[in-house]
């Protein structure tokens, strides 16, 4: 993504190898949401089942060569949407550029994601503390992009029992973590608060990873 196309973000270091880029994706909000709607038309959002039999409150879809899925058999990446048997929608070029640029700004040059998990939160939806461990190469960072309602991001340590920081993520904010922070626990508190002018009472999160 050319430098002149990127809004100059406020950079906050929230870990040794974790950076919060305030408003980094703000100029691309409308375009990104149009891309999400196109992805949804090919691979609709759904509430997946965890291996423990619980229904996730967050609605999920994917784009890219691989999509993250969960059911009673476990967490994993698949090249096809289990609901249709068809490949996941291709990752929009905008998404690839945005994720690569954010990773570069956070000190992880050359990031080339091949999986984008799209999470949609309604009020009350949450994401419990977890680690991203289904990828083969932990040397690659995680890039998380927020749109819509403000959410409270929980960022902990490498063990679940360790304290968590609570960080407000607003429309257009991007969090990037990797290196020694790559396996830190993280989550999202139940969504609440004021509606957003663009998305209403909804939050959409794009999580970019290198799955293989």
Model region roles, listed by residue range:
Residues 1-212:
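Non-heme Fe(II) oxygenase metal-center motifs and adjacent flexible, charged/small-residue loops
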């Amino acid at each position: 993504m050319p430098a002149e196309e990127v809004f100059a973000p406020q950079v906050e270091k929230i870990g040794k190898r974790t950076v919060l880029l305030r408003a980094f994706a703000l100029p691309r909000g409308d375009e990104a949401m149009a891309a999400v709607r196109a992805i949804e038309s090919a691979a609709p959002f759904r509430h997946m089942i965890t291996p423990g039999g619980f229904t996730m409150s967050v609605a999920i879809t994917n784009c890219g060569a691989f999509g993250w899925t969960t059911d009673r058999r476990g967490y994993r990446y698949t090249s096809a949407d289990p609901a249709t048997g068809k490949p996941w929608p291709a990752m929009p070029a905008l998404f690839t550029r945005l994720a690569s640029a954010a990773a570069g700004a956070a000190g992880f040059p050359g990031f080339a994601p091949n999986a984008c998990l799209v999470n949609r939160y309604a009020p009350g939806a949450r994401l419990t503390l977890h680690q991203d461990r289904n990828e083969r190469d932990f040397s690659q960072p995680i890039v998380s992009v927020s749109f819509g309602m403000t959410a409270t991001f929980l960022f902990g340590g490498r063990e679940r029992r360790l304290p968590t920081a609570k960080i407000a993520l607003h429309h257009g904010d991007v969090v990037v973590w990797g290196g020694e922070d790559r396996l830190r626990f993280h989550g999202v508190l139940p969504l609440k608060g004021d509606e957003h002018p663009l998305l209403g009472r909804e939050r959409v999160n794009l999580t970019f990873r290198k799955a293989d």
